[in-house]
């Protein structure tokens, strides 16, 4: 009965019934699922989805559920619209519904069009039904539901599932163009989900937050909803918040949300652990048991248990060769078999008597073999009971002990014993044997063939000394008065006054002809300063100034002795005092002259302007010019010019230059405005160039290699000669370059001197040598003279017109030579020894310390360690 009533309904009401049945079915399914979840306790990870399932989908769209609901609503609305159109209804949208002004008109239209059969009460009667009727009614509803599903969804099948597999909850539909569309179920956030505790995140991307300053919102969340700007409190609220800081307050503002940025308890705990250097991850155990990967026990692995190579099982060719050699030696008899060795041993035991030297013969020495020289036989003084004349007295023993071991005639003292058994062991036997072994090892023997040459023919033909006069031959005057060693002396340009400096700290000036002392200045007080003494002094080459430069310790004193006339003394003092004004007001112009400038002076004018700018930084001689706009800093760094006090002015001192280290040598430029000083212990400031007219002192070198021993100016060229311990360098002051490097080939140079013509140089060394360098030839010496027995202290050319030079040594002897330099460059200089002058005493192995030639005469002045100065004349 129920089936007939359902089938008898009008076709126009079928869609409406289907929609109603679909809604009822959906509500029933939802209610059933809710009850099932309560009963069975469905886990939070399961999803309850109604829709189509596409197992092949991989997408993960979070808005799939919302899209599904919207699609179902659109389908329902479309069904309702189609149903209304079938009934003749004209309403299609929300705007059309506004045309009905009242409910009466709407009800009237519905009453006219609706069929009473649509609202039939069949199946909903309150009367009791039989069991068969109830079953028929249920079958009718089931058929209606099936029909509704077929009509509403067509080919799409609806499945209601409650499963845990997310891939089976996907909905598979199509877009308007027919392409497949996959809708995944919405994720239900639970406690373990990543998004369960996440706040609304601003998804504006790379758009700056400043773009939302004039808008009430600050961006959009993941669902496209606006994130409203948080309300800002008043100034009072902000003050209260700053006073009562909430938990996790940082004072920072989140740019994405506009809300204050807070730190959680977990983040605070993490920060605390980092500050306390604790373990930040509780799951990590810092004290895990040690796993010793590398042990002493060898592990059997492919690296050590490799298969044996084939070559170990193949006979070796090299072993075969060695075996063949052994076989050959056995056949030749060089190797005996055990049987033959036993037989030979038995024969030897039978022959007991044999000649030890039977098969030996004298082997002649090799032709190049040189036997060691035999020791000299002992003399009478080496006897244990020598004659009385060989024994030394107390005075001779004391003299023998004071001598240097190298200078002793014998290395033992003869002693007398009554019997041979009383002679003790010789304590120097091991040392003498060791020294002899060193001599044989370090001094190889050489076989020399004797030449049958007349020795007289080897001596060059030299002119007679009588033909080379004048030269000094005798001591005419002795200048006595100093109590210490006279280390230096100098003669004034006119040749009238001799200045000497001694270890007693005094400078004395003597009259040359009479030997009378005319002036004395005590520059060093030996009671307060016993280490300093007069090291060097030299007169200014300008005879009109009368200036004497004295080096005492670290100071350089410029004196004008009151022995000249008023005019000369006044000129010298004014020359020194003019520099004080320059030092006060500074330099206002460049010292370097511009190339191409019209200069009226000779080459020396440029030299004087450019000497103080010479700089050499390496052996290649590439110098760098120092700036001269302001030379005061350089002067203050290397030396300091000091105005003397009243007591020093009374001694004739006009200026004092204070250096860093002890000044050993001083040399004037021929113009008299510049002078160079040498301080060997001052390293890079060992060489200083001082300018008298400007009171300037500067170091021309940034660094120096080796210890500087002496420095001289060229007689007329803008060149500077600097001598270190082993080499001599020549610098061009105009071009700021290194011109030449001389290699004397000695260990320790003492001093140098230049020939007045400037093309030859003399050098003296502490290893008893005098070297003559020709600057036009090679860097090695032209002549090396070895005639002194001890260190050569000084060597000097005659600065006048006489071809003389002399050398002084610690042996107390002065050698005078004739040295002629020819104008022809193809002719070698002529060197002739003239005279040996001896008169100074040797004190503590120190003899003559300094010599100087008279500027005009062939006179020689010398200073010795005996405290005297001597004049040697013709």
From Swiss-Prot:
Task: Tell me which PROSITE patterns the record gives.
Answer: WD_REPEATS_1 (PS00678), WD_REPEATS_2 (PS50082), WD_REPEATS_REGION (PS50294)
Compositionally biased intervals (Basic and acidic residues): 27-41, 78-89, 593-602
One GO cellular component assignment for this chain's record is: PeBoW complex
Q: Where is this region: Required for interaction with NOP7?
A: 312-429
Q: Which Pfam families match?
A: BOP1NT (PF08145), WD40 (PF00400)
Q: Which UniProt keywords apply?
A: Nucleus, Repeat, Ribosome biogenesis, rRNA processing, WD repeat
List compositional bias (Acidic residues) regions by residue number. Answer: 55-77, 95-104, 128-139, 603-620
Q: State where the protein is found.
A: Nucleus, Nucleolus; Nucleus, Nucleoplasm
Presence of the UniProt keyword rRNA processing in the record: yes
A GO molecular function held by the record: large ribosomal subunit rRNA binding
State the residue spans of region: Disordered. Answer: 1-148, 593-640
WD repeat extents: 481-520, 529-569, 658-700, 703-741, 744-783, 787-827, 843-874
PANTHER family hit by this protein: RIBOSOME BIOGENESIS PROTEIN BOP1, RIBOSOME BIOGENESIS PROTEIN BOP1 BLOCK OF PROLIFERATION 1 PROTEIN
General function of this protein: Component of the NOP7 complex, which is required for maturation of the 25S and 5.8S ribosomal RNAs and formation of the 60S ribosome.
Quaternary structure, per UniProt, is: Component of the NOP7 complex, composed of ERB1, NOP7 and YTM1. The complex is held together by ERB1, which interacts with NOP7 via its N-terminal domain and with YTM1 via a high-affinity interaction between the seven-bladed beta-propeller domains of the 2 proteins. The NOP7 complex associates with the 66S pre-ribosome.
What family classification does the UniProt entry report for this protein? Belongs to the WD repeat BOP1/ERB1 family.
Q: What is this protein called?
A: Ribosome biogenesis protein ERB1
Give the organism, scientific name: Lodderomyces elongisporus (strain ATCC 11503 / CBS 2605 / JCM 1781 / NBRC 1676 / NRRL YB-4239)
Q: What is the lineage of its organism?
A: Eukaryota, Fungi, Dikarya, Ascomycota, Saccharomycotina
